[in-house]
Amino acid sequence: MAVIESVYARQILDSRGNPTVQVVLDTEDGAQGLGLVPSGASTGEAEAWERRDGDKSVYGGKGVLNAVKAVNEVIAPKVIGMDAADQRALDDLMIELDGTPNKGKLGANAILGVSLAALYASAESAGLPLYRYIGGTNGHILPVPNMNIMNGGAHADFATDIQEYMISPYGFDTYSEALRAGVEVYHTLKNVLKKEGLNTGLGDEGGFAPKMKSNEDSLKYIMDAISAAGYEPGKQIGICLDVASSEFYNKETGKYRFDGEERDSAYMLDYYENLINEYPIVSIEDPFNEEGWEDWAAITARLGDRLQFVGDDLLVTNPARLQKAIDLGAANSLLVKLNQIGSVTETLDAIELATANGYTSMVSHRSGETPDTTISDLAVAKNTRQIKTGAPARGERVAKYNRLLEIEEELGSTAQYAGYSAFKACKKYLAK
């Protein structure tokens, strides 16, 4: 047993300079786990509650000292003496201590910090790398890195309406080859933008964030960059979008403020269809607002046999919302963010529910990140086949990509790159 001996939380900073929670958990056998909690910029309304202090005179109200206090004074006394390896019992206890549907008392950032720290301590106690501890002997598939090389929306002061333009290097034999291709396209894109006289400053996730005349301009520049880097758009490298449409949806009018005009759902659906007919787009995240269940079901029915539709704000890594989507036929892919649901156990439950019902899963970072690399190990452990963790720039993003390189090397000949198989809905189109 990895009996918990001590738990201690402190306030640290994330990649945007905002406070977040760090938890250190020690076990009696000498193992130690570190839990670092990320934070999002565009967040779903149904996400688990992130506890902030609210004192505007300190960090603009974004301090997390109350969440730290919840760990040190409420959670720690209850979990000391428990087996850190009994992840479900530990997480269930913290959820029970909180007693709210959205972790609205202790805070998801408090609970997740302890949950992650226990996970790491247990892996160290067992003498296993995290991906092997979580996934057992079957974790062997390296995910396709969906790399956010152009930032817009809430990640870049709305340089474009669409929040993320990602490249997906699926047409390669190994993860390391795919990563190299993505990096080369990223650097080539910088030169393409410079030649056009555009700003090459970076957004929250390391992608370029120039102000564009239209959302489609970004796609054209990315296509140019893929070709200029010596790769074939569509065959080797596809495009994924995170529209994050809830960010420009008006609840009062039921319309989307898109490309400077008020657009209804029917227009947006047609727009997406035209877009995928013109560009090698294989995945669209949050094409409709987070409560637009009928619109989600409509686009999945119409285009779901040729495109991956990823639920982020819609599903918030919540098994209950995912089950509703399954019942309605809304979306066909789950975005996985640990802090959206707030515990390791619930995250794993969501992935398993998605897999059992034919949904793909894309493990994801947040815009406010730390050097933590849990999501890299998680993607391999559960063979999710996809990960998104920003551009190949900024240390907190690159750390995740580098961790996958390490795992690929450790796995040796048993490592398999997901490649085309990552995009189940697009298989017959990618085969062309």
Swiss-Prot record:
Catalytic residues as annotated in Swiss-Prot or TrEMBL: E205, K337
EC number from the UniProt entry: 4.2.1.11
A GO term from the CC aspect: phosphopyruvate hydratase complex
Cofactor: Mg(2+)
Cellular location(s): Cytoplasm; Secreted; Cell surface
List of residues binding (2R)-2-phosphoglycerate: Q163, K337, R366, S367, K388
CDD domains: enolase
Catalytic activity: (2R)-2-phosphoglycerate = phosphoenolpyruvate + H2O
GO biological process, one term: glycolytic process
A molecular function GO annotation: magnesium ion binding
UniProt-listed Pfam families: Enolase_C (PF00113), Enolase_N (PF03952)
Gene3D superfamilies linked to this entry: Enolase-like C-terminal domain, Enolase-like, N-terminal domain
InterPro entries reported for this sequence: Enolase, Enolase-like_C_sf, Enolase-like_N, Enolase_C, Enolase_CS, Enolase_N
Cofactor binding note from Swiss-Prot or TrEMBL: Binds a second Mg(2+) ion via substrate during catalysis.
Pathway note: Carbohydrate degradation; glycolysis; pyruvate from D-glyceraldehyde 3-phosphate: step 4/5
Chain sites annotated for binding Mg(2+): D242, E285, D312
Key words, A-Z: Cytoplasm, Glycolysis, Lyase, Magnesium, Metal-binding, Secreted
Lyase in keyword set: yes
Family recorded in the similarity comment: Belongs to the enolase family.
Protein's UniProt name: Enolase
Species of origin: Bifidobacterium longum (strain NCC 2705)
